[in-house]
Amino acid sequence: MTPVKVWQERVEIPTYETGPQDIHPMFLENRVYQGSSGAVYPYGVTDTLSEQKTLKSWQAVWLENDYIKVMILPELGGRVHRAWDKVKQRDFVYHNEVIKPALVGLLGPWISGGIEFNWPQHHRPTTFMPVDFTLEAHEDGAQTVWVGETEPMHGLQVMTGFTLRPDRAALEIASRVYNGNATPRHFLWWANPAVKGGEGHQSVFPPDVTAVFDHGKRAVSAFPIATGTYYKVDYSAGVDISRYKNVPVPTSYMAEKSQYDFVGAWCHDEDGGLLHVANHHIAPGKKQWSWGHSEFGQAWDKSLTDNNGPYIELMTGIFADNQPDFTWLDAYEEKRFEQYFLPYHSLGMVQNASRDAVIKLQRSKRGIEWGLYAISPLNGYRLAIREIGKCNALLDDAVALMPATAIQGVLHGINPERLTIELSDADGNIVLSYQEHQPQALPLPDVAKAPLAAQDITSTDEAWFIGQHLEQYHHASRSPFDYYLRGVALDPLDYRCNLALAMLEYNRADFPQAVAYATQALKRAHALNKNPQCGQASLIRASAYERQGQYQQAEEDFWRAVWSGNSKAGGYYGLARLAARNGNFDAGLDFCQQSLRACPTNQEVLCLHNLLLVLSGRQDNARVQREKLLRDYPLNATLWWLNWFDGRSESALAQWRGLCQGRDVNALMTAGQLINWGMPTLAAEMLNALDCQRTLPLYLQASLLPKAERGELVAKAIDVFPQFVRFPNTLEEVAALESIEECWFARHLLACFYYNKRSYNKAIAFWQRCVEMSPEFADGWRGLAIHAWNKQHDYELAARYLDNAYQLAPQDARLLFERDLLDKLSGATPEKRLARLENNLEIALKRDDMTAELLNLWHLTGQADKAADILATRKFHPWEGGEGKVTSQFILNQLLRAWQHLDARQPQQACELLHAALHYPENLSEGRLPGQTDNDIWFWQAICANAQGDETEATRCLRLAATGDRTINIHSYYNDQPVDYLFWQGMALRLLGEQQTAQQLFSEMKQWAQEMAKTSIEADFFAVSQPDLLSLYGDLQQQHKEKCLMVAMLASAGLGEVAQYESARAELTAINPAWPKAALFTTVMPFIFNRVH
């Protein structure tokens, strides 16, 4: 076999530019993204995109053997950008020839194609950022590219090794996720290979997958033949949803369960496919996502690629069978897992696969089709097909296959009972098999149910478990704090709830409160004896004492923690830190060894142990150990620092800097460890040698100097912040910033940390100090405004603060947007809001979301022509899940201008505008969803036809206007029917003479409004996508009231109750003058009353 080749090169790829990172912190406490919290802190977001395309150079790393060739882009999250099947001369993963980001990612920019690795949540926060990488050669001729990062949102580390072996036609992916924190964390892992969509695509799910779930298991469908309603699509006729062409709307589905280790996709057009193989006990997740085979999906295809067409996301979950589905990672725990991605050909739909082979056994009109595809050499193997329960084989052939080759055949003229196919190795061991699956008429599994609200819980056990779920899944609308606090309200000494609260308080740097909760937990744990099974409360209290410099108390609790198995490793590590701080290196080495016996993968302890060997003069032992550690952890920046520190060679310095590439997280991790080990002088030396010129490392470096010597570093830290926006999120960063009391920007960053952790009083104190020290700093005033509105509900105070901010930064489009948003949420008149935006029109037009507000304000103030100009010329970039904001204004604009022509007795011109409203212009970057009934457009088309004397066309249009769903949802999303559609349905029914049906519809609307107005509403527990980047929050209950009023208003109009209509409209307008389609109804309702009633 030819050895695997690996090389690095710069590749030029056509690339669309993004806008700059937003320098403002985003506190998104209510944002929902992919079914969990859409919070973006500590990152800066990028929410503006460009149509400018340039040929950009990217760092690429290639792997190639005789069968496949793979390109990895470390500068784009370490994704596999291209995977080429050399045998079939095809991309076995969808290849996008351009880098064309759309607003799909957690932080904004996201690109399609290749294989993305989504962790620690979906989509990967750093999917559009550089990560670390290095290369490793193996003695057998294999090559590995390691990519990874320390991710600052959750404080976890990942290493992923991409390996090609000389004798294997598969990409082997070995990953390690590590938690280097003192408290547990949570992560998800969904590898996300894209495959070619189109008419020829078919997903290859295992034969035992008979049901699939939606996100959060909130809905379920039969599979592969769907027979019910799924994603609002009627599949009752029986539709094969494994085919791309049969799924018309954006749709996710995830296998309920499977006992097989594979999932894949087949392209009928290319006679080739992709398979993923992994242990299903570790990797149960099998998912398909598509944008939908429709105008809607095609619009997203155009937003993501120039010429490569539609794609499917074939996702594979590790420790996860659904999204969101996070798994726990204990303090200092490491999880390892392997996955294989491989091309295959010839066999089509297959029934089982392993890391060595793929088998097919399928009945068709031709007979019994069988096949075998080799991933690795199959020498001396046998393939047998038998009827279960019978001895004689229908097929029993010797097999000799090289990788990437296949054999197949057909058994004719027989119709046996259940069959099995078996592949055996040279020793007769069955290595892969499949028994024909016999479908059974089983009921669909139940969908998930939302848990009780915290105040309704009566059991501490239930309170703790729900709190754990919310914490684990990063739930967007409910807080685990509420459930743990409910638990301690029921039982003040409940061990688990107090322990959970202690850990949460520790994570947000409230160490005294962490001690208090841990002490409460220990009152129960130590009530009968001092040696409980669980030592976690002692461990977290010790860590909290240590953070406060109370080392004697910390030592006592660390010793108590080592008595218990689940806290022994952490306890000995704590003792090792204290020993190192005191210069007692021999004791520190012993404690490290004790800790490693309990947890041998704790990279913190491994690094400390190696450093203590160096400091105690045992350099030879340190070097031997470090060589092994660097083979195990080739991306650990602290190990590479140790490699330089031990010898101070220029080559070692270049290696260390080459790995870190100036990324702040690497500098912060190593410096933070050294500070925690009581070695601030080494930390300062390390930061000086690495020379990372980003804000937080510069602050950390400054904090280690005397106050009189750090002015230059502090000034530089402030100056470079906009170049790479990152806010503090670790305890070491907080401690450093708190020590630099003379810096106003450090006060701001501390306020950001505490506000994000929901320690609002601390945050406000820091922002107030910030603006006292630097009253010209806009973001300090913005922070105070956010708190004033969201937490104090004080419009006047928030407005004054935001006015200060915008006056200080009049070119800042986000500040203008938020000032307008504040007016919108407080019910300001359209005229007042429009005056502000038009006075700053150039700034307002910098943002799509603010432009959408402008469009609505122009409509409300009778200036539809101004809105039409923008809608005809501006290129918009919607967020995934936030579609409809601009297209709704486009439809409204067409309706308003059509009405103007109707009112001027120009029905033909009106008809043309209405017809155009049925198709969105390409510059809006959105397509229509199938099933969109457009009742308003068809109603007015009928009015136009009637005005032109075409009663046949009028009736046809009325029939269309009268169709559609007649339900009203409490929560509304982009794919939900607007509530006013029901009104137009009822109006159409009236004009068709179906008065009784219309009367019933309007009566049901009125009843719904009356009943729901009495209902208290809460956020949708299973919401999947609410992507708006809004730091100022609306009142959910008021929004519900507005919806009820609008439904009541339209119901009254439909029933001819003019007084009730006017009353509801006045009340609605008083609380929200910009209610949906107010411009239309205010204009046309006199005509409606005259025409219909």
UniProtKB/Swiss-Prot annotation:
GO MF assignments: carbohydrate binding
Highest taxon, organism lineage: Bacteria
Pfam families linked to this entry: DUF5107 (PF17128), TPR_16 (PF13432)
PANTHER family reported in the protein's UniProt record: CELL DIVISION CYCLE 16,23,27, CELL DIVISION CYCLE PROTEIN 27 HOMOLOG
Protein's name according to its UniProt entry: Uncharacterized protein YphG
Organism: Escherichia coli (strain K12)
Designated gene of the protein: yphG
